Amino acid sequence: MTEEFNESMINDIKEGDKVTGEVQQVEDKQVVVHINGGKFNGIIPISQLSTHHIDSPSEVVKEGDEVEAYVTKVEFDEENETGAYILSRRQLETEKSYSYLQEKLDNNEIIEAKVTEVVKGGLVVDVGQRGFVPASLISTDFIEDFSVFDGQTIRIKVEELDPENNRVILSRKAVEQEENDAKKDQLLQSLNEGDVIDGKVARLTQFGAFIDIGGVDGLVHVSELSHEHVQTPEEVVSIGQDVKVKIKSIDRDTERISLSIKDTLPTPFENIKGQFHENDVIEGVVVRLANFGAFVEIAPGVQGLVHISEIAHKHIGTPGEVLEPGQQVNVKILGIDEENERVSLSIKATLPNEDVVESDPSTTKAYLENEEEDNPTIGDMIGDKLKNLKL
């Protein structure tokens, strides 16, 4: 055989060429391929058949299959005038996979892949080659046991590609975050001030409780937890508790939502409707003194005013002459204004007096109708509560 003929036999196909052929024989550790246009058969070692680990070539090919591969080496035996092309199907699959993944990365697209293995540091997935989802990129939530993903097909995004080091990093967390953001935006657009909705207590702080209302957290300030004075949120709610809340305000730009639990609850006054009536004599506790009278709590959260003229039969200059906060007293209900939630009381009417003088109806009428010049303001009525309130 001449040197020219030998060169013609081996130079038609060279290393790096991409070739196609038909599988002629499947052996234990390799596959024999008839190369289209080639002078020799091709050999694909088992390690170069797939990007995945296989125990037998028959797992991925069979006789008669058409395959495509790169030529990694041309072997020629001059003495016997025989040769073979050493091929890599794996190299071609990897190249195609990187090209596909690069396109998805450039376009920020979501792909689906099956989890083939769960390891200590994350998830191994099949993306045409071995891809890895690190533990930190699996979810926006804490997941204690990654084995729940074993065998599942998950939605992921390409985070990083490094072909030189055969490195493919993927993120399931990025997909979750994108979906959560879309849900949050949709929810924010659907909410309106005044809506009463269900929520769950997510976390507590010194100044209030954050409520999960379906993917978005809103704040219930400590002053909006109850009609009664609350020192700390833990007195009223606990993490994980289901609650009803009313939307007080929404700032869609900053995604800040102000909520109220108090506004969904009956007021203390509503709770006592039908319990008290005019002319009833009941017990109460003096909670605050003002220059025009004394505020007496007759039920939890319900206070009535004893005008200074209704404190004693004798003339007094200030309520403090005969009363002090915390003092228990008997009071007579002079009037109830349900619409404005006001109660007019009298201590004098419960006290014996030789010269009994009927309570002045004009005093009661003025308080209930808010006509007296020195009638208490909202600040007068809840001043102590505001002083004690920790913001």
Curated annotation (Swiss-Prot):
Q: Do you know which InterPro entries this protein is assigned to?
A: NA-bd_OB-fold, Ribos_protein_bS1-like, Ribosomal_protein_S1-like, S1_domain
Signal peptide from the UniProt entry: none
SUPFAM superfamilies named among the record's database cross-references: Nucleic acid-binding proteins (SSF50249)
Gene3D superfamilies attached to this UniProt entry: Nucleic acid-binding proteins
**Keyword set for this entry?**
Repeat, Ribonucleoprotein, Ribosomal protein, RNA-binding
Q: What molecular functions are annotated in GO for this chain?
A: mRNA binding; structural constituent of ribosome
This entry carries the following GO cellular component terms, namely: cytosolic small ribosomal subunit
All copies of domain S1 motif, residue ranges: 16-90, 108-173, 194-262, 279-348
Question: Where in the chain are disulfide-linked cysteines found?
Answer: none
Pfam annotation, one family: S1
Q: Which family does it belong to?
A: Belongs to the bacterial ribosomal protein bS1 family.
Role: Binds mRNA; thus facilitating recognition of the initiation point. It is needed to translate mRNA with a short Shine-Dalgarno (SD) purine-rich sequence.
This protein is called Small ribosomal subunit protein bS1
